[in-house]
Regions:
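Ligand-binding clefts/hinges and TM-proximal coupling segments of bilobed small-molecule sensing domains
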Residues: 171-185, 223-226, 255-283
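Extracytoplasmic small-molecule ligand-binding "clamshell" domains
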Residues: 49-121, 129, 261
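Periplasmic-binding protein-like
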Residues: 61, 139-146, 209, 213-256, ...
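Short helix-initiation/N-cap motifs at beta->coil->alpha
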Residues: 81, 97-107, 151, 168-170, ...
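A ligand-binding cleft/hinge motif common to bilobed small-molecule-binding domains
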Residues: 104-107, 119-129, 175-178, 198, ...
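Extended ligand-binding regions for polar small-molecule ligands
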Residues: 81-90, 150, 157, 163, ...
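N-terminal export leaders
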Residues: 27-31
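A conserved helix-loop-strand patch within extracytoplasmic ligand-binding domains
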Residues: 93, 97, 121-123, 135-184
Length: 283
């Protein structure tokens, strides 16, 4: 069956070339990890009865511009980092970021080793069976990266019969496997996908638009380009343990506060070079 995508055109983003500091890994689906056990041993401070609590935040810090570690300071930086710190400030709690593998985030939430997960996570009905999500804080989607001199792929339909690179277990892999007659090549890391594209071993990479854009600008060296069309439209949310209504309430309240006072828009423009969509601010 031919894969049919709705085309959602995105606004161009202006990027600051800070260097592609860490390998990017595309967000992976949670379906295979729901029953996995977390390996952490420290109970989050959220459970302690202190006047000012510390929110333990889990993220895979290999997803610039959402989250990464500065190569010099070793501090966590990115859109997700700034958003959760701003929410913490609005709600009066401290934030401690812990770097976990993406596929360990849901298990860590379920066992209480982290309080929230913020990691370019798409809100979906399947994931909502395991965790509760905040209101959206970013509108994303899957995009396409091709070599700069490629003129044969300009839209979703052009992917038919092509060689497509995706990272294992990702939403990009799921989409690629629906493309008619496509040869899907699966890699452990997203950076391997981009390298294979530049070596002309594949025709295109399917991956999230923000990380596509970041790679093209900071590490593509003019040899690749991101197409100005999205294959899907996805809302990103902050995940909390299923049933933790009090924490979810505070996260949503803090998110609403920073959207209203202008801090959200300031952070958004810092990392994406443009103002957030009006519909994103209206939630």
């Amino acid at each position: 069956m031919t894969l049919k995508f709705k085309a959602y055109y995105r606004n161009p983003a202006v990027w600051i070339d800070t260097g592609f500091l860490k390998p990017i890994m595309q967000k992976r689906t949670f379906l295979s990890v729901v029953t996995a056990a977390a390996a952490l041993s420290v109970v989050p401070a959220w459970a302690n009865q202190h006047p000012k609590r510390t929110l333990i935040v889990g993220m895979d810090a290999t997803y610039p511009p959402f989250g990464s570690q500065d190569s010099e300071t070793r501090q966590y930086v990115g859109y997700d980092v700034d958003i959760i710190r701003a929410i913490g400030k609005a709600e009066g709690f401290d934030v401690e970021v812990r770097n976990l593998a993406f596929d360990g985030l849901i298990p860590a939430l379920k066992t209480g080793n982290i309080d929230i997960a913020i990691n370019d996570i798409t809100i979906s009905p399947e994931r909502a069976k395991s965790v509760d999500f905040s209101n959206r804080y970013y509108i994303a989607g899957l995009g396409i990266v091709v070599n700069a001199d490629n003129t044969t792929i300009t839209k979703a339909e052009d992917l038919e019969g092509k060689r497509l690179a995706v990272s294992i277990g990702s939403t990009g892999e799921a989409a690629a496997r629906k493309v008619k007659n496509a040869e899907v090549r699966v890699f452990n890391q997203l950076t391997e996908c981009y390298l294979e594209l530049r070596n002309r071993g594949v025709d295109a990479v399917l991956n999230d638009i923000p990380t596509n854009d970041y790679y093209v600008v900071t590490a593509g060296h003019g040899k690749v380009k991101a197409l100005p069309v999205a294959l899907t439209r996805e809302d990103l949310g902050i995940a909390v343990k299923k049933g933790n209504k009090e924490l979810l309430k505070r996260i949503n309240r803090g998110l609403a506060t920073i959207k209203q006072n202008g801090e959200f828009a300031k952070i958004f423009e810092k990392w994406f070079g443009r103002q957030p969509e009006t519909e994103l601010l209206s939630d």
